[in-house]
From Swiss-Prot:
Membrane topology: Multi-pass membrane protein
Glycosylation sites recorded in the entry for this protein: N321
Stated name of the protein: Membrane-bound acylglycerophosphatidylinositol O-acyltransferase MBOAT7
Organism listed in the record: Homo sapiens (Human)
Pathway: Lipid metabolism; phospholipid metabolism
Disease: Intellectual developmental disorder, autosomal recessive 57: A disorder characterized by significantly below average general intellectual functioning associated with impairments in adaptive behavior and manifested during the developmental period. MRT57 patients have moderate to severe intellectual disability, and delayed psychomotor development with poor or absent speech. Some patients manifest seizures and autistic features.
Molecular functions (GO terms): 1-acylglycerol-3-phosphate O-acyltransferase activity; 2-acylglycerol-3-phosphate O-acyltransferase activity; lysophospholipid acyltransferase activity; O-acyltransferase activity
Segments on the Lumenal face: 23-33, 94-194, 262-426
Amino acid sequence: MSPEEWTYLVVLLISIPIGFLFKKAGPGLKRWGAAAVGLGLTLFTCGPHTLHSLVTILGTWALIQAQPCSCHALALAWTFSYLLFFRALSLLGLPTPTPFTNAVQLLLTLKLVSLASEVQDLHLAQRKEMASGFSKGPTLGLLPDVPSLMETLSYSYCYVGIMTGPFFRYRTYLDWLEQPFPGAVPSLRPLLRRAWPAPLFGLLFLLSSHLFPLEAVREDAFYARPLPARLFYMIPVFFAFRMRFYVAWIAAECGCIAAGFGAYPVAAKARAGGGPTLQCPPPSSPEKAASLEYDYETIRNIDCYSTDFCVRVRDGMRYWNMTVQWWLAQYIYKSAPARSYVLRSAWTMLLSAYWHGLHPGYYLSFLTIPLCLAAEGRLESALRGRLSPGGQKAWDWVHWFLKMRAYDYMCMGFVLLSLADTLRYWASIYFCIHFLALAALGLGLALGGGSPSRRKAASQPTSLAPEKLREE
């Protein structure tokens, strides 16, 4: 493990006992204590580069104050424009930020765009209320008022997920501060239930990254290996990639669970990133609070089992980095300048690649996804329904195998980063996934398959495993 990875791991692990300390604290101590810890971590890991996050926060807050009814689009333009400046610092002869600064900036961008959207929703709701002449009851997810500058700073620097996620909305943060009976919210058991696979994933990461180092792909000797060996190598590279993020995101979720952050009654049917989808009245006593069943779906960032065993490329995106996927769906996909599912996905993947960075490998990887989505959608709608139940089961296994190979292939661009290294590796295996996807798309079109946006998702398999075997 690199020194940076050790630093991330230490930050994630210390957030767990800190969470237990904050869990039963009052709203004021939670707000300012969590912000102080987060700011301290930022200053320690980023040093003077912390200024970038402060400038981004102040700029967004100014836009919210100036144009509250249209601040969402303005905040999106501002934060994404600042990302370009932030990544071009070395080209401008300015000090290059640390990797930790980049991580803070990425999560901060998501939070500030979401905050601006929540403020805009509040103002639009107030306008409708004034126009109608009567007051409605509390609306699900709506903010009570516009956050002040200090409240915006406290949300932005809250230590929870400050470098690794999960992403959370200001409404989720506010609900944590105002939990009526935090002592009744379970933490220890959910934490242990969530944490148990992490040590195994960590060992698998260390073993796979040692046996199949990524650096080998950059060496000339690698390309003297036979084709089957070159094809196989992307499988353990993606395996190590998954194990690394599984450990990081499980640890990050455990930090949230320790603090009771993102806990809602099961009846609220919370979604990762978005929070509750149904209104649930707060409990009126500690006894009633203790009698409720809670979950932490709001801050769930990874479904490891479904990521590995879902059938389709489309579903693989849903279970990976789940809170960020919600953000992309809510703020990018829905406003995409197209109606087609594949074109909307291409737009979303383009901006997702930009959010990750300027390395060509990100764009090569992310922009392969829409081709795979179009191919699997057309071919599946053309052929799967014509098969017997046994044939459909066999289809799903083959589809799953190809889905995993597609992600193996795309992962190589994500980790190799450079244009030359990515294309060199893909060329060494003859761009097999690109050609396979094009062939599947052509066959699906020839057989009259419909576009993915017109297919009924309910009739399609999402996982090879029975529901009862899926990850809790």
